[in-house]
């Protein structure tokens, strides 16, 4: 996935310093490729389009949000602490099949950070358990 961003440095600080992505390569201040695991060249590309680029229109077709799967529940709790510390936590939810946090990157792209719920809690019952409930973080 490649996201268009206004400011590469600001976006890099968010994805690298807060979300833990690593720089895989850069293209002369135009594009940065980031990896989450190091197992492939990149999981996310950031393409600079400039400070005057308009924001996406919420009611237009296009990307709703980016969902990034974290390793486990402990990783979600760590992400909650980091986002809360920086005032970037927009919401959280227990979806029955997953546990999710919501934030936005510097350009307003909504980001969901989640881990799957244990399979035995939902397998074969997704249509009855998939919901939006408050997320208990204790």
Predicted regions and their residues:
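Vicinal oxygen chelate
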Residues: 5-9, 66-110, 115-121, 135-138
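Short glycine/proline-enriched turns and hinge-like loops at secondary-structure junctions
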Residues: 27, 57-60
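Core segments of cupin and vicinal oxygen chelate
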Residues: 3-48
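Short, solvent-exposed beta-strand edge segments and adjacent coil->beta transition regions
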Residues: 61-65
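Short, solvent-exposed cationic patches
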Residues: 126-138
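A short, polar/proline- and glycine-enriched secondary-structure boundary/capping micro-motif
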Residues: 56, 122-125
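Acetyl-CoA-dependent GNAT
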Residues: 47-51, 116
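Short beta-strand/turn micro-motifs at beta-sheet edges
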Residues: 51-57
């Amino acid at each position: 996935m490649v996201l268009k961003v206004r400011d590469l440095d600001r976006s890099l600080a968010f994805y690298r310093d807060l979300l833990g992505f690593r720089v895989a390569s850069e293209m002369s201040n135009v594009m940065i490729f980031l990896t989450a695991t190091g197992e492939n060249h990149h999981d996310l590309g950031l393409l600079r389009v400039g400070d005057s680029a308009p924001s996406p229109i919420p009611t237009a077709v296009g990307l709703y949000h980016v969902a990034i799967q974290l390793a486990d529940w402990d990783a979600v709790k760590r992400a909650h602490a980091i986002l809360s510390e920086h005032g970037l936590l927009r919401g959280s939810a227990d979806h029955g099949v997953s546990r999710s946090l919501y934030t936005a990157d510097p350009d307003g792209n909504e980001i969901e950070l989640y881990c799957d719920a244990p399979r035995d809690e939902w397998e074969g019952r997704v249509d009855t358990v998939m919901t939006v409930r408050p997320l208990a973080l204790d």
